[in-house]
Amino acid sequence: MPMSEANDRALEKKLNWLRAAVLGANDGIVSVAGMVMGVAGAGADRPTVLLAGIAALVAGSISMGGGEYVSVSAQRDTEISYGRTAEEVNAHPWGAAWSSFVAFAAGAVLPLIAITGPWEAYRELATVLAVVVALSITGWWAAWAGKSSPAKSIIRNVIISLLTMGISYAIGTLLGVTVL
């Protein structure tokens, strides 16, 4: 295999891993933050918010891992059907699945800690701040690794997360009921 082709394959493998890790972490952060903000907006107490967040973490991790496994398996099967040998294909379904599962769970822990911490009166604000900081870091990291604009990546991440949390919180507030 020529050196440039080997370099291309190494870069492809690195970018696939990075994509899965960033997508998994961002999805964990944003999905679970949206869930817990919606439940908090409905007026739920700390244990209820924590339970909803844990359920979202578990379901999301399994979903991301399973989805990544299916996606990478299909990619691998397609490449092999077009004549590439199994050794030439950089698609590793189980590795990708595990990476997405762990990345989602790692990202999801942050909003859970922020919303259920000892700062009850500021739980929503703490969550928003923690999520903005975390997504700024993942946005910068993705831009650095991909040699693209950190500002664009960070702004994109932060806007999506603020919209997700704001809409979820508003829906929770509008539809929430107080349980006596």
Region spans (language model):
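Juxtamembrane boundary at the C-terminal end of a transmembrane helix
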Residues: 169-180
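Hydrophobic, small-residue-rich transmembrane alpha-helices and their short perimembrane loops
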Residues: 1-110, 114, 118-131, 141-142, ...
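Cytoplasmic-side transmembrane-helix entry/capping segments in multi-pass membrane proteins
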Residues: 151-160
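Membrane-embedded alpha-helical segments of multi-pass transporters/permeases
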Residues: 69, 136-140, 169
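Transmembrane alpha-helical segments of integral membrane proteins
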Residues: 132-148
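Short helix-terminus and kink motifs of transmembrane alpha helices
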Residues: 64-68, 72, 148, 152, ...
